[in-house]
C-alpha cells in the first residue's frame, strides 16, 4: 500500500481520479510535465532545455515560462474546449538552462463559462512568475467556430456574395 492509500484509509476519504480532457496533444517537453491534477488544481514541472535558451548566458526565453503557465491554467480548468482570452503576468526572476520550474495553477473564480486561474511558478523557493489567466469554455473547438456572420465576412473582404 502506498502512503497516500494509507492516508486515505485513515481519513476515510478517497480522492477521485481526474483525467486530463484538454490539451492532450501538447508537447510536455517544451510546455511542462503534468505532475498532479485535481478538480481546479494542477502542478506542472518545466525542465529547461537548450531549445529554450535565448542568449549565450543560458537565459530561458520568458515565452517558455508563459507557455507552461498557460498549459497549467488550461489543465486546471480541464474542459475540452477551454481557451485563453486574457492574462496579466509578472516575470519576477530569470530562469536559466537546466533549471526546473514548478508551476501551480488554481481556479479562483467561476462565472458561467468563464474561469479565472491563478498561476505561480517557483524555482526552488524563488517565485519566478505569477499570473492571472482568464479563460472561457466554448461549445465547440475554437477552430470550428464561425466567428463572422456573412455580412461581416463581406465587409472585411473574406467572402464575396455572387448575385
Locations of regions flagged by a protein language model:
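HotDog/MaoC-like acyl-thioester-processing domains
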Residues: 1-13, 81, 96-97, 108-163
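Short, solvent-exposed helix-to-loop capping segments enriched in aromatics
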Residues: 14-24, 71-80
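Catalytic strand-loop segment that frames the active site of acyl-thioester-processing enzymes
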Residues: 24-60
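A generic structural signal for short beta-strands and their flanking turns/coil linkers
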Residues: 28-30, 40-42, 83-87, 99-101, ...
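A structural signal for short, well-ordered beta-strand segments
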Residues: 44, 87-91, 105, 119, ...
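Compact, glycine-rich, soluble single-domain proteins
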Residues: 53-66, 70, 74
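A short, polar/proline- and glycine-enriched secondary-structure boundary/capping micro-motif
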Residues: 54-58, 85, 140-141
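Hydrophobic beta-strand-centered segment that forms part of the acyl-chain substrate-binding groove
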Residues: 71-101, 107
Amino acid at each position: 500500500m502506498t502512503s497516500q492509500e494509507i492516508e486515505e484509509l485513515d481519513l476515510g476519504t478517497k480522492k477521485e481520479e481526474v483525467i486530463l480532457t484538454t490539451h492532450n496533444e501538447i508537447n510536455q517537453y517544451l510546455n511542462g510535465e503534468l505532475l498532479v491534477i485535481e478538480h481546479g488544481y494542477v502542478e506542472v514541472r518545466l525542465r529547461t532545455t537548450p531549445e529554450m535558451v535565448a542568449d549565450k548566458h543560458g537565459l530561458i526565453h520568458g515565452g517558455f515560462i508563459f507557455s507552461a503557465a498557460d498549459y497549467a491554467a488550461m489543465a486546471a480548468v480541464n474542459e475540452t474546449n477551454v481557451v485563453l482570452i486574457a492574462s496579466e503576468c509578472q516575470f519576477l526572476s530569470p530562469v536559466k538552462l537546466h533549471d526546473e520550474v514548478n508551476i501551480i495553477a488554481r481556479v479562483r473564480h467561476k462565472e458561467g463559462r468563464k474561469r479565472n486561474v491563478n498561476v505561480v511558478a517557483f524555482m526552488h523557493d524563488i517565485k519566478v512568475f505569477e499570473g492571472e489567466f482568464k479563460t472561457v469554455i466554448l461549445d465547440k473547438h475554437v477552430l470550428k467556430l464561425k466567428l463572422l456572420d456573412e455580412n461581416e465576412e463581406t465587409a472585411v473582404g473574406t467572402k464575396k456574395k455572387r448575385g
